Amino acid sequence: LEGISKIGDQLMNQGGASEVMSLGIYGWFFEQFVGKQGLDYANNGNGRDDVATAVDFDKNEAAKNILTEWQTLNQEGYAPIVGKGGDAGLADFSAGKSAITLGSTASLKQILQDVNGKFEVGTAYFPKIKESDEGGVSIGGASLWALNNQDPKKLRATWEFVKFLISPESQAYWNAQTGYFPVTTAAHEEQTFKDNIAQYPQFQT
């Protein structure tokens, strides 16, 4: 985020945007900003060493770093308050009002449809808070769960449905329609996947 200040004026004066960045207030974004710093969201190693019992971002300065950079961008006029939710900043971007927005891959198809060729949509990796950060993002969004209800017939039927959902064909279609990553790299060999990448190269990011 700290690098946005360096290009803010250029985007507004030369790029024609009235906002530099439309960034919604959304919990998943906060989680990723913590992860990009390489810091833990919760104690006990993010719950990997033992059961997490409390958040850690208020002690390891992760939250402070996020809010400090965000407040700076807001005070400089580069990141106005656009509302709560993961889609809060998308409308301004799709309308050409803001130069940059933030979203997961699951937002990409909707953005491309909303922009509808009015301007070129570029994609990039999830931003860091500081240039020196060396962390990464965590998974989020749709997950597939099967519960053990002790009924053998239902469990067999559930497993058949799960196999259908995680098949390369289904995952290629799922990726093309939503932007979510396919859970199997075999989906990359499906024509649906290849056609989508050819039409929308932004999905490669």
Short names for language-model regions:
Residues 3, 81-95:
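Short helix-initiation/N-cap motifs at beta->coil->alpha
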Residues 3-52, 98:
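Extracytoplasmic/periplasmic solute-binding protein
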Residues 5-11, 49-83:
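Glycine-centered hinge/linker elements that transmit conformational signals in sensory
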Residues 20, 99-104, 122:
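Paired acidic/hydrophobic, glycine-rich loop segments that form the ligand-binding mouth/hinge
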Residues 26, 86, 103-108, 141-142:
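Beta->alpha turn/N-cap motifs
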Residues 39-65, 113-115, 128-136, 189-195:
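Short, solvent-exposed loop/beta-turn-alpha elements that line the ligand-binding surface or hinge
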Residues 75-76, 113-180:
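Extracytoplasmic/periplasmic substrate-recognition and gating elements
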Residues 124-126, 175-205:
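Long, aromatic- and glycine/proline-rich binding clefts that accommodate carbohydrate-like moieties
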